[in-house]
Amino acid sequence: MSDDTVTPMMAQYLEIKAQNPGAILFYRMGDFYEMFFDDAALAAEALDIALTKRGKHRGEDIAMCGVPIHAAEGYLLTLIRKGFRVAIAEQMEDPAEAKKRGSKSVVRREVVRLVTPGTLTEDTLLEARRHNYLCAFAEIRDEAALAWADISTGELSVTACPLPRLMPELARLAPRELLVADERELDWIEEVGCALTPLSRASFDSASAEKRLCALFGVGTLESFGNFTRAELSAMGALVDYLDLTQRGKLPLLRPPVRETVGGTVQIDAATRRNLEITQALAGGRDGSLLSAVDRTVTAPGARLLERRLSSPTRDLGLIHERLGAVRWLTEEPRLREEMRASLRRVPDMDRALSRLALDRAGPRDMAAIRAGLAQAQEIAQRMPAEAPALVTRALEALGGHEALVDLLDQALVAEPPLLARDGGFIAQGFDADLDETRRLRDEGRGVIASMQAGFIEVTGIQSLKIKHNNVLGYFIEVTSTHAEKMLSAPLSERFIHRQTTAGQVRFTTVELSELETRILNAGNRALDLEKMHFAALRTAILDLAGQIGRAARSLAELDLISAFADLAVTEDWTEPEIDDSRAFAIEAGRHPVVERALRRTGTPFVANHCDLSTGETPAVWLITGPNMAGKSTFLRQNALIALLAQAGSFVPARRAHIGLVSQIFSRVGASDDLARGRSTFMVEMVETAAILNQADDRALVILDEIGRGTATWDGLSIAWATLEHLHDRNRCRALFATHYHEMTALAGKLKGVENATVAVKEWEGDVIFLHEVRRGAADRSYGVQVARLAGLPASVIERARTVLDALESGERESGGRRQTLIDDLPLFRAAPPPPAPAAPKTSPVEERLREIQPDDLSPREALKLLYDLRALLT
């Protein structure tokens, strides 16, 4: 065969690869997924596996690498996390079937799935406590919308989303993949950290989208789900089209779409989410975030629900009160709460198990998860009292009515089923008599043969009769030649069929033995086939009740979250907030949940603080001054987090909290350079501040820290001053404004609703002690030099700083001209005063003796004696 000849197998590979150009192709060959050409080079490097070669193509070696099927999911996860997409081509027949078409026929293969970051369903590829969202952004004329789905749980939602709102929404959802029309350029999408997938404009066609959605949900019109705009239909249609492409026609079990309104949740932009560390700490990861500090959930769906609530606190006052009422009820029922949480700990992730069953990607353990989850649901429902809050009552209604399915799964499945259906062994003994007999033949073939042999001995009366086996005859009955006449005569000859006569033995068979032989030889395959048949039937039985099971799973997640909030409130001494539609914001003894948790580990108490922005209908601003390290930023953040927790339905870390409904939370606390986009720290700060001033409404809660610090003093003061005036006059919102510009404290006497507050410090013998107490009033000093000293700056720098500070403060008390003269006279560029000369080191006795020695005057004997004398001085 020449190098240019393409083998049938390689021709098939190239054809499949051409149909999936943007993905690494996992090409099934026996027990391995093989990769070739460029795919092999990319995968070998990404997976750190050996790169080999297999034959030639057009004169060049064909690069090849492979991964075993049993370990494929781990390799898949690595590739997905590194940004690759993977097309999986499976063998659709066994080699024996292929050979029926000809000796050189290739086993038929098809891509059964395209694995992408937003379309994962396996537990090994997913984070159990986080959603895995796939988003689609669509624009039609002057309308735009964002749709998102988690195919591992069946959630589908959509909202109107003008382009300026896209970044905040993506920050809220944190999707793994975003679908856009191929002509749309979104270079900045990398900031969100998700994969960007362009689709053809046809995928976003709204007319086709409506038909696809109606077919998916089996309805004639979508009106019962809501009145969707063309852009919303377009976004949802693109999602469904992409899922059809990646799942190769096996669409996931999506629930009817939920249309979220823009005003339904508290608006929080990307910068604020980052600054408040709601679900992710600034250092990256979950540890150190609000989510990690408050998560007491005991189920994966409950944890995902908690993240959704913290990311999207509601503005529905009735819903807030309903959730808080349920939490209050469980705080007052400790025994019931603990029993519920004990049951919930045994609830598996039914949502994801159900999704895998719908995609025909499930194993027996997914069915066992449904069984265990529904059984615990029944137990919880039976334990709950008749009198319960409305939210709990509604949840309980969805937990019952699954007795028949639970009984079926109990009878059908073993207690601990294997991971994969192909391994068998998951159908319980006694569920199917035929399967039991087949397994008995497979596992106890010798015993069955011995039992049949005993029966034949009894019938024939020949004690030496044996049932034997060889590769030519298979199973046969053997007697000695002395019994041949008896066996060949009626009535035995009617049952026993002569097979062979040898030199001393005669061999027979019977219909029963032939059938038994066939059953034994096929028992293994037949047992697997029977189990697969039962698996398919059980899968159908579960999917027929998918809607009810999904509602039960969501209800269990709700109960988990309610009980988690109640447990948090009791153990952390949190209080129920009073939420109404006023403009109040009064917090007594508020605490920062994350900082308090960190301090507790070191045995340090957290200093609680009050905050009162309740001034009726007028704007309410606290202007906070005080030194760095005193706790201003912590105070700002803790009040924003208290508002967020309250509207998420949780009790809050305070002695008392009265909060008028908050529509938006904005935070500008800390900034850093954005080198990739050519923006300095000051520019980043100004962009974030501009977003706040342009968007905050009169129900917003705004926290601002050190506005204007990144530029010259007078420029910074001017910007901070004007920003505060704008918040007061135009935005008219509730705000906490921390600054080092003490000149701004004069605004408290000029603007109604602006009050001064300061963080208390104490000086003791030249040191500054931070009390971390926020009090009304203004700070008289910044204590910057003292903080610098605590940070470890050299003593010469601290002394020089004090000199310059004293001169500048003296100039403040003089006229402007005198002040400028003092600044001009300061030797600002003179070298720092030299450090004091070190004291002369004390001379040792050895050194003194050495100075007295004249080497040229010493004899050898004297030199040797001197060495001993010097050594004695050392001791």
From Swiss-Prot:
Residues reported to bind ATP: G626, P627, N628, M629, A630, G631, K632, S633
Gene Ontology CC annotations of this record: cytosol
PROSITE patterns in alphabetical order: DNA_MISMATCH_REPAIR_2
Xref: Pfam families: MutS_I (PF01624), MutS_II (PF05188), MutS_III (PF05192), MutS_IV (PF05190), MutS_V (PF00488)
Biased composition (Basic and acidic residues): 845-855
Region (Disordered) location: 830-855
GO biological process: mismatch repair
Cystine crosslinks: none
Source superkingdom: Bacteria
Record's keyword annotation contains Ribosomal protein: no
SMART domains found in the cross-reference section: MUTSac, MUTSd
The keyword ATP-binding appears for this protein: yes
Matches recorded under InterPro entries: DNA_mismatch_repair_MutS, DNA_mismatch_repair_MutS-lik_N, DNA_mismatch_repair_MutS/MSH, DNA_mismatch_repair_MutS_C, DNA_mismatch_repair_MutS_clamp, DNA_mismatch_repair_MutS_core, DNA_mismatch_repair_MutS_N, DNA_mismatch_repair_MutS_sf
Keywords annotated in UniProt: ATP-binding, DNA damage, DNA repair, DNA-binding, Nucleotide-binding
CDD domains from the UniProt entry: ABC_MutS1
SUPFAM superfamilies according to UniProt: DNA repair protein MutS, domain I, DNA repair protein MutS, domain II, DNA repair protein MutS, domain III, P-loop containing nucleoside triphosphate hydrolases
GO MF entries: ATP binding; ATP-dependent DNA damage sensor activity; damaged DNA binding; mismatched DNA binding
Classification via PANTHER family: DNA MISMATCH REPAIR PROTEIN MSH1, MITOCHONDRIAL (PTHR11361:SF34), DNA MISMATCH REPAIR PROTEIN MUTS FAMILY MEMBER (PTHR11361)
Role summary: This protein is involved in the repair of mismatches in DNA. It is possible that it carries out the mismatch recognition step. This protein has a weak ATPase activity.
NCBIfam families, per database record: mutS1, PRK05399.1
HAMAP family in alphabetical order: MutS
Family that this chain belongs to: Belongs to the DNA mismatch repair MutS family.
Name of the featured protein: DNA mismatch repair protein MutS
Organism of this sequence: Cereibacter sphaeroides (strain ATCC 17023 / DSM 158 / JCM 6121 / CCUG 31486 / LMG 2827 / NBRC 12203 / NCIMB 8253 / ATH 2.4.1.) (Rhodobacter sphaeroides)
